[in-house]
């Protein structure tokens, strides 16, 4: 359900843990292609990635497969993207040239495979069966279904009001709005 404070709660939780945006975690909001999701997973391979309303990857078989690899239950997961792409290089091509591999990464390329030890959080308003029809992603995840009734939603909004902009506005005025 939209408007339930999912994004706010995730961001607050990350900050409360002392994590720093764009260093310890990154929030990707809106659209993301499969190859860019893969690239972000490489860049944050030991950190936390939050995909907020990036629902298109659920409809793409390659996106779902990369997610399944990233969400596997092993501590370290091997993720690969072995399709032709100008953004991907084969690490085997640089076995004798570590500096060349470093330069490829510095130039924005990503290896065709890498070990992932990070965490992924997806925030979506999609129905769980629509986002994950076969249940493969859910079987590798913790799903928190946020679909409160109207009374619970109003209670949640009242809890969040003091923290919402403009913070200097009186609480009674925010409640009236």
Protein language model features and the residues they cover:
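Walker A/P-loop nucleotide-binding motif
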Residues: 1-10
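Conserved nucleotide-binding/hydrolysis micro-motifs of P-loop NTPases
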Residues: 3-4, 31-34, 54-57, 126-130, ...
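AAA+/P-loop NTPase substrate/partner-engagement loops
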Residues: 4, 16-48, 55-61
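Alpha-helical scaffold elements adjacent to nucleotide-binding pockets in ATP/GTP-utilizing enzyme cores
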Residues: 9-13, 40, 62-70, 136, ...
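Conserved catalytic/switch belt of AAA+ P-loop NTPases
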Residues: 59-116
């Amino acid at each position: 359900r939209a408007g339930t404070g999912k994004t706010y709660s995730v961001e607050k939780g990350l900050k409360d843990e002392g994590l720093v945006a764009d260093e310890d975690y990154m929030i990707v909001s809106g659209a993301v292609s499969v190859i860019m999701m893969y690239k972000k997973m490489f860049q944050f391979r030991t950190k936390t990635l939050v995909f907020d309303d990036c629902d298109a990857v659920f409809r793409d078989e390659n996106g779902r497969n990369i997610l399944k690899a990233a969400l596997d239950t092993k501590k370290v997961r091997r993720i690969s993207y072995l399709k032709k792409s100008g953004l991907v290089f084969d690490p085997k091509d640089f076995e004798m040239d570590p500096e060349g591999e470093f330069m490829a990464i510095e130039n924005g390329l990503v290896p065709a495979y890498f070990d992932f030890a990070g965490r992924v959080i997806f925030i979506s308003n999609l129905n769980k069966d629509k986002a994950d029809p076969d249940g493969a992603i859910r079987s590798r995840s913790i799903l928190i279904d946020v679909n409160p009734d109207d009374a619970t939603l109003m209670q949640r909004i009242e809890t969040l009001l003091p923290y919402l902009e403009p913070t200097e506005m009186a609480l009674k005025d925010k409640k009236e709005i």
